[in-house]
Amino acid sequence: MSITVERKKALISEYADLEKNTGSVEVQCAILTERIINLTQHCKINFKDFHSKRGLLMLVSSRRKLLSYLKKKDLNRYTQLINRLGLRK
């Protein structure tokens, strides 16, 4: 199941520094994390769905790339985002 429009707006308002700044790394990682959580639940139920599993791996990879970019650019924002998202780094 994908993210609803209301949930995406809530994530944008929670993680964006400005209201219209939807392209910031924090917002993108938050949206990707929400999609990863939904897709992980789907893959646990439908364990033979290899297309969704590949999509999940692609989402995790893109989030990892964004997080490594943020870690390179601003370590303080990176650690705050990791703590807010509840990731284990």
Swiss-Prot record:
PANTHER family: RIBOSOMAL PROTEIN S15, BACTERIAL AND ORGANELLAR (PTHR23321), SMALL RIBOSOMAL SUBUNIT PROTEIN US15M (PTHR23321:SF26)
InterPro entries linked to this entry: Ribosomal_uS15 (IPR000589), Ribosomal_uS15_bac-type (IPR005290), uS15_NS1_RNA-bd_sf (IPR009068)
UniProt protein name: Small ribosomal subunit protein uS15
Lineage: Bacteria, Pseudomonadati, Pseudomonadota, Alphaproteobacteria, Rickettsiales
Keyword rRNA-binding: yes
Biological process (GO), any one: translation
Family, similarity comment: Belongs to the universal ribosomal protein uS15 family.
Coiled-coil ranges (or none): none
Subunit structure: Part of the 30S ribosomal subunit. Forms a bridge to the 50S subunit in the 70S ribosome, contacting the 23S rRNA.
Gene label: rpsO
Keywords carried by this UniProt record: Ribonucleoprotein, Ribosomal protein, RNA-binding, rRNA-binding
GO molecular-function term, one example from the UniProt record: rRNA binding
Protein purpose: One of the primary rRNA binding proteins, it binds directly to 16S rRNA where it helps nucleate assembly of the platform of the 30S subunit by binding and bridging several RNA helices of the 16S rRNA.
Pfam families (alphabetical): Ribosomal_S15
One Gene Ontology cellular component annotation held by this UniProt entry: cytosolic small ribosomal subunit
Organism: Orientia tsutsugamushi (strain Ikeda) (Rickettsia tsutsugamushi)
